[in-house]
């Protein structure tokens, strides 16, 4: 049986593990620049200048990392 690949979780986990700087665009146009410190099914913790913010995923439009994120292919999962 194949395991389901969750691209969102892989992407956010790589941002977190590699401490990749990211710009988070919210639906209201606001931008957060920082690092992903953690996430769950509904929220993401973004740290900016030593301060953490809990952001609900439904308020997020886009994650724009400063470098490409390497995702595992299906054979590696």
Curated annotation (Swiss-Prot):
Keyword Hydrolase: no
Subunit structure comment from the entry: Homohexamer.
Domain called Sm: residue spans: 9-69
GO biological process, one term: regulation of RNA stability
Protein origin, superkingdom: Bacteria
Entry's Gene Ontology cellular component terms: cytosol
InterPro entries documented for this protein: Hfq (IPR005001), LSM_dom_sf (IPR010920), Sm (IPR047575)
Taxonomy of the source species: Bacteria, Bacillati, Bacillota, Bacilli, Bacillales
Family: Belongs to the Hfq family.
SUPFAM superfamilies, sorted: Sm-like ribonucleoproteins (SSF50182)
Function: RNA chaperone that binds small regulatory RNA (sRNAs) and mRNAs to facilitate mRNA translational regulation in response to envelope stress, environmental stress and changes in metabolite concentrations. Also binds with high specificity to tRNAs.
Protein name, UniProt field: RNA-binding protein Hfq
Alphabetic keyword roster: RNA-binding, Stress response
GO molecular function: RNA binding
């Amino acid at each position: 049986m194949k395991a389901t690949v969750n691209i969102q979780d892989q992407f956010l986990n790589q941002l977190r593990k590699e401490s990749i700087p990211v710009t988070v665009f919210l639906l209201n146009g606001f931008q957060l620049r920082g690092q992903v410190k953690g996430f769950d099914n509904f929220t993401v913790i973004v740290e900016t200048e030593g301060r953490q913010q809990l952001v609900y995923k439904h308020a997020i439009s886009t994650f724009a990392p400063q470098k490409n994120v390497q995702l595992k292919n299906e054979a590696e999962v």
